[in-house]
Swiss-Prot record:
This is Protein ApaG. Residues 3-127 form the ApaG domain. It holds the Pfam family DUF525. InterPro entries: ApaG_domain, ApaG_sf, Uncharacterised_ApaG. The lineage of its organism: Bacteria, Pseudomonadati, Pseudomonadota, Alphaproteobacteria, Hyphomicrobiales. GO terms for biological process: error-free translesion synthesis. The gene is apaG. HAMAP family: ApaG. Disulfide bonds: none annotated.
Length: 130
């Protein structure tokens, strides 16, 4: 698991390879990831938007922006947590994701919190001899 804390808000990411959805012979590798956001701060916050930077093993970078996460803009009171799962396809057997969430505090001011960088790696990648 990968974790980062910004302004008392902890973001933890747990990636996992989705072998059933992947087709390595077609250069299609799919990962899921589970994100847990814990509000350890003293104020109520709302997740407004997300930004992801996804880099594959060839250095190709894809940027993803959008409002909320999985169709929601959750509000977290102090001590609350929120969890969601999503996925990411790549054309290479490894990559890296990193990002940030745009949050809004009780006073309406917006601020960013870090999503930790995490690696996407095929477990036990098989090697073939020609």
């Amino acid at each position: 698991m990968y974790s980062a804390v910004t302004r008392g808000i902890e973001v933890t990411v747990e990636p996992f390879y989705l072998e059933v959805q992947s087709e390595p012979e077609e250069n299609r590798y799919v990962w899921g990831y589970r994100v847990t956001i814990v509000n350890n701060s003293s104020e109520t916050v709302q997740l407004c938007s997300r930004y992801w930077q996804i880099t594959d093993a060839n250095g190709h970078v894809q940027e993803v922006r959008g409002s909320g996460v999985v169709g929601e803009q959750p509000v977290l009171d102090p001590g609350d947590s929120y969890q969601y799962s999503s996925g990411c396809p790549l054309t290479t057997s490894s990559g890296v994701m990193v990002g940030r969430y745009q949050m809004k505090g009780e006073d309406g001011a917006q601020f960013e919190i870090e999503i930790p960088a995490f690696s996407l790696d095929v477990p036990e990648q098989r090697r073939t001899l020609n």
